[in-house]
Regions:
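Iron-sulfur-cluster electron-transfer modules
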Residues: 2-128, 243-251, 274-466
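Juxtamembrane/interface segments at transmembrane-helix termini
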Residues: 23-42, 94-98, 128-146, 164-172, ...
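Long, contiguous internal "core" modules enriched in hydrophobic/ aromatic residues
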Residues: 89, 94-179, 188-204, 242-243, ...
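Feature representing long, continuous alpha-helical segments
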Residues: 158, 255-258, 262, 277, ...
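Iron-sulfur cluster-binding electron-transfer modules in prokaryotic oxidoreductases
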Residues: 170-176, 219-233, 323-585
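Conserved histidines in hydrophobic membrane contexts and catalytic metal-binding motifs
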Residues: 183
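Ferredoxin-type iron-sulfur electron-transfer modules and their immediate structural context
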Residues: 191-304
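Short functional micro-motifs and their immediate structural scaffolds
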Residues: 259-265, 269, 312-325, 513, ...
Length: 585
């Protein structure tokens, strides 16, 4: 048994106290900044939040997903090693004061069942991760990280010194004490290292995963009162530069894994946008320097305009970050700076003057379909694509859907005064134009109960986005959801067609934002037996490149974002590709 002098005990107390004080100071500094953010955290749906923590923290489902199963398992070895060594660490320091948590029997049992196995697994895990970072060097991990190297050395040292002690490999009292102090020094070193590095996620990620909004994307509403005083409008504009509390917590939680950049369609298409840096890491130091969350103006403007707002970055993040901040920088640029890119000025002017994206009159389709009356079951919301003939081929799709409704005996009608849902204005940051369109639409739609549309962008806005500003009294469904329900109810029967290989491209708004991947497949499989999945499908779908209002930038010739998915489809050698979105189409 090692004996410690009073001086050694005092040195240990001072060392640990300074480490804990530094750690707590840095933690509280960050939390103080986070609490300056706008919009409070929500803790509704408590059982679902706890289940999410269990799945994503304890089971590591997100960490081990997206083609990173091996890295995820290695990370789990390290994380569980820290958990199982919690009691061992407490006992280790109490030994210096002659206190022992374990009797000899329990100590040996714990060593055999947990200590020894996890010491080896933890060492193997961290060495495998170090090999991946320093030898394989995945692009997503970014530049060389000396801190990661130090952490590797620290963890391996902890495991070795623990095993040396437990296996009685040292006989000399001096050697035993040196080993003990080395182990203690490394643990104390972590207290100084963690707060100043990405490894702060060890503390923050469980809380971030618990607190993160269920809604994707999650951007606080920006209500604009046209009758507000000049002071109130000034405060609104100042507020545009501030992050919300959950966005600020995201930035301090980031583990710098680069998964967001890996899946970003703009980055993959050759653009400058790097979500890991532009939306997260580049804001971290400005927040620490200023002690505040007024950092939206630090986001790279050009990168912000490249974003398709597809939410792939948010979907893949293993620590619960809502990564995308294009909405914040665009709203700041448009509303606070009055800076609208040239390619979008006509679009916004059309929305303001005519209520639709094209500044066009209604197509003949509006006259060919029945008008909605209160005795009908559904409002068929056409959207700009169909109502204003933005794509003549899409009008044929709308007519085919109405044939399905007719066959099922479902009554429906269209609204003659339907305005654009405002999605392009919302995505471009013009919240004033968006609110004007929204107010008109909500006034009409709150008179009905059920709405269906073929445009996922319209579904997101009519249902989810509008509810941030208004009480919504109606329900909106995507047309594939309606078809799937009619199939389940036996109201329509489909004879499998003669189509050969058929695949499906998941629209981002339908799969990630609305969490709907089953309904379209139910409908397709009923008609096409030879169905297969694309490489990136479901909630892992690859954006077509038209989201975030970038469809109106399609003639710019910049980047290859819009070609990536098309190339995947061609390489799949499918005969037919189906999609549930007019923009993807």
């Amino acid at each position: 048994m090692i004996k410690f002098s009073l001086l050694e005990q005092i040195v240990l107390i001072l060392f640990l106290s300074s480490g804990l004080s530094f750690f707590l100071y840095q933690l509280l500094l960050r939390l103080k900044i986070v609490l300056k953010g706008k919009s409070d955290f929500s803790i509704d749906q408590l059982p679902d939040r706890l289940l999410r923590v269990f799945n994503e923290v304890i089971l590591h489902k997100k960490v081990a997903s997206g083609g990173r199963k091996f890295a995820g398992i290695m990370h789990a070895f390290v994380m569980y090693g820290f958990i199982f060594f919690g009691l061992i660490t407490i006992n280790h320091f109490l030994m210096a004061f002659g206190i022992h948590l374990f009797n000899e029997t329990f100590r040996l049992w714990y060593f055999k069942i947990f200590g020894a196995p996890w010491a080896f697994l933890c060492s193997f895990g961290i060495l495998a991760l170090a090999y991946r970072r320093f030898v394989l060097k995945p692009k997503a991990l970014g530049k060389f990280s000396a801190t990661s190297g130090v952490v590797t050395i620290f963890i391996v040292t902890l495991m070795i010194t623990y095993l040396i002690d437990e296996l009685y490999l040292l006989k000399s009292p001096v050697a035993l004490k040196v080993n003990w102090w080395l182990h203690s020094g490394v643990i104390g070193g972590f207290l100084f290292l963690i707060p100043k590095s990405k490894h702060m996620h060890l503390v923050l990620s469980p809380f971030n995963i618990f607190l993160k909004p269920f809604e994707i994307p999650h951007h606080p509403a920006i209500p604009i009162d046209l009758e507000a005083s000049e002071e109130e409008l000034d405060n609104l504009l100042l507020d545009l530069s501030r992050l919300s509390k959950d966005q600020a917590l995201d930035i301090f939680t980031c583990v710098e894994c680069g998964r967001c950049t890996d899946v970003c369609p703009a980055n993959r298409g050759g653009g400058i946008l790097d979500p890991k840096y532009h939306f997260i890491l580049n804001l971290k130091q400005p927040m620490l320097d200023s002690g505040d969350v007024n950092v939206v103006d630090k986001i790279n403007v050009e990168a912000g305009w490249e974003c398709t707002t597809c939410q792939a970055c948010t979907e893949v993040c293993p620590v619960g970050n809502h990564v995308e901040k294009a909405d914040e920088i665009r709203s700041f640029q448009v509303l606070a700076e009055g800076d609208v890119p040239q390619e979008y000025q006509k679009l916004l002017r059309n929305l303001q003057e005519t209520g639709n994206t094209e500044g066009a009159s209604s197509s003949d389709l509006l006259k060919q379909l029945p008008a909605y009356t209160s005795d009908k079951e559904l409002v068929l919301w056409l959207g700009c694509f169909a109502k204003h003939a933005m794509d003549p081929n899409f009008i044929g799709s709308v007519k085919n859907f109405t044939k399905i409704l007719d066959s099922a005996g479902v009554t429906y009608g269209v609204l003659s005064n339907e305005q654009c849902s405002g999605d392009p204005a919302n995505k471009l940051g013009d919240k004033l134009t968006y609110q004007l369109l929204m107010d008109q639409n909500v006034e009409e739609l709150n008179k009905v109960k059920n709405v269906t549309t073929m445009c996922p962008h319209c579904v997101v806005n009519l249902q989810k986005e509008y509810s941030k500003y208004h009480e919504i009294k109606y329900e909106v469904k995507h047309h594939t959801q309606v078809i799937s329900e009619l199939l389940e109810q036996g109201k329509i029967n489909i004879n499998p067609g003669s189509l050969e290989k058929v695949t499906y491209h998941d629209p981002c708004n339908l799969s990630r934002t609305l969490d709907e991947v089953s309904a379209p497949r139910n409908a397709i499989k009923a008609a096409a037996p030879d169905f297969f999945e694309l490489d990136e499908s479901g909630k892992e779908t690859l954006c077509c490149g038209a989201g975030g209002a970038l469809w109106w930038k399609k003639d710019s010739g910049e980047g290859r974002t819009h070609l990536l998915r098309a190339e995947q489809v061609i390489e799949s050698k499918t005969d037919t590709v189906v999609t549930g979105c007019n923009f993807c189409y």
